[in-house]
Each structure stands twice: as C-alpha cells, then as structure tokens.
C-alpha cells in the first residue's frame, strides 16, 4: 500500500534515468518503491541534506557506484524528483545542491502561479 506518491518535475529526472544502465534503473525503481510504501524511510535510502530548506537525496548504491537523486516533499504525500548524478566524492557537490534548490524553488513558484 502506498503512503506517498512519487512524482517528477519537468524532464530532469527522466533525462538522468534514461542515461543509466538497466541494472542502475532497476535499483532506482526498487528504492523509489520503498519510498512510496514505507512511512519512515531508512536513511540508507532517503536523507535530508543539511543546510537546505527541505531538500532530500534518494541514495542509490550499486556495487561501488553511488548515485543521488534530489527530491523534496510537497505536503506530506508527494516526493518530487529533481535532478540526479553519480557521486564520485565523499561530499555531495555544492553545485549539484544549488541546482536542486533552484529547481525546488521553481517548482513552488509554478505551483503558486498554477502553471505546473
């Protein structure tokens, strides 16, 4: 049973997803299913990004490859998926976080103006 609905914003996630090998796409789908179905999602799959106003990262690991997909909650039911990237360093790159915050703000502005 779903406790939240996963939705995407524009084409950002779809573009990232389409570029990934099938094994990575399968793992992403598995984790998104967990996020949809579990009320309290473990931090190994979904983690708040410190210093942001509500931005989270979906955490995907396949062997030694680590991927992050930015998202946020709209109300308490929706996780909106933004951009994604393959993580190559210990810390999430600041530029990637800034891009995701910009997209999150853009989403809320469009929602407010009824242009979503």
Task: For every predicted segment, state its role.
Residues 82:
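ATP-dependent carboxylate-activation loops
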Residues 1-66, 75-79, 87-116:
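Basic, Lys/Arg-enriched alpha-helical interface segments
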């Amino acid at each position: 049973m779903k406790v939240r609905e996963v939705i995407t914003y524009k084409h950002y996630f779809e573009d990232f997803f389409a570029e990934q090998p099938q094994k990575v796409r399968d793992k992403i789908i598995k984790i998104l299913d967990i996020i949809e179905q579990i009320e309290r999602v473990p931090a190994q799959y979904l983690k708040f990004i410190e210093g942001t106003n509500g931005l989270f990262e979906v955490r995907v690991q396949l062997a030694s490859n680590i991927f992050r997909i930015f998202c946020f909650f709209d109300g308490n039911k929706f996780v909106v998926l933004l951009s994604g990237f393959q993580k190559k360093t210990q810390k999430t790159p600041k530029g990637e976080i800034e891009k995701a915050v910009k997209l999150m703000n853009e989403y809320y502005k469009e929602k407010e103006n009824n242009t979503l």
